[in-house]
């Protein structure tokens, strides 16, 4: 009693029942074939319909395959697909629904870079605030503190920086700021 039976995470965006899929849809699939097929698909020019079908398949809530595939590789397949098509709104939605996935730092960096590059600083900072995550990535840590300052939450920014400093993070810019 109280035992966790399945330690694999459910990752995705769409309800499997709405798309005719199942949470365990990857269980009987050979992991190596998933990776090879995704590599092949990523190099193809797909019609909009094919792209939408593959997106639904990849982003439907499911467990990763049981046998032999590293969960990071499986998540990487999803991240690479999202980045390839640069749909910022879809990526943001995926990030918000899968906050606890470490591999999402790559997606978070991608979205932030895209938003900052078009001068959407407020939108980038609001996303970081909504994710409200401690990052292992120094780049994301820096921007999460910067965004608190940008959003005029200096006290929170100072507190966040102090907490990060205790974990070994150091940034000369913030040392001067606080």
Language-model regions, residue ranges each:
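N-terminal alpha-helical interaction modules that lie
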Residues: 1-75
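Long, His/Glu/Asp-enriched segments that create or flank divalent metal/ion-associated functional microenvironments
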Residues: 10-11, 164-178
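Solenoid-like repeat scaffolds
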Residues: 20-29, 43, 58-68, 93-103, ...
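Generic helix N-cap/helix-start motif at coil->alpha-helix transitions
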Residues: 68-75, 100-110, 134-143, 156, ...
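Alpha-helical segment of the N-proximal tetratricopeptide repeat
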Residues: 73-87
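Residue-level signature for tetratricopeptide repeat
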Residues: 81, 110-115, 147-148
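Structural motif corresponding to the intra-repeat A-B loop/turn of tetratricopeptide repeats
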Residues: 85, 118-119, 151-152
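Solenoid-repeat scaffolds in large eukaryotic assemblies
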Residues: 88-91, 121-125, 154-160
């Amino acid at each position: 009693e109280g035992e966790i039976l399945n330690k694999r995470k459910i990752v995705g965006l769409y309800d499997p029942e709405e798309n005719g899929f199942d949470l365990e849809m990857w269980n009987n699939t050979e992991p190596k074939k998933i990776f090879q097929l995704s590599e092949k698909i990523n190099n193809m020019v797909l019609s909009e319909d094919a792209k939408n079908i593959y997106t639904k398949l990849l982003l439907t809530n499911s467990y990763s395959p049981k046998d032999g595939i590293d969960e990071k590789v499986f998540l990487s397949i999803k991240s690479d697909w999202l980045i390839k098509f640069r749909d910022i709104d879809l990526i943001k939605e995926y990030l918000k629904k899968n906050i606890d996935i470490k591999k999402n730092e790559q997606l978070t960096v991608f979205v932030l870079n895209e938003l900052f590059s078009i001068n959407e600083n407020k939108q980038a900072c609001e996303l970081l605030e909504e994710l409200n995550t401690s990052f292992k990535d120094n780049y994301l840590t820096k921007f999460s503190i910067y965004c608190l300052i940008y959003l005029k939450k200096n006290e929170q920014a100072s507190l966040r920086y102090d907490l990060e400093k205790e974990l070994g993070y150091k940034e000369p810019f913030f040392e001067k700021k606080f």
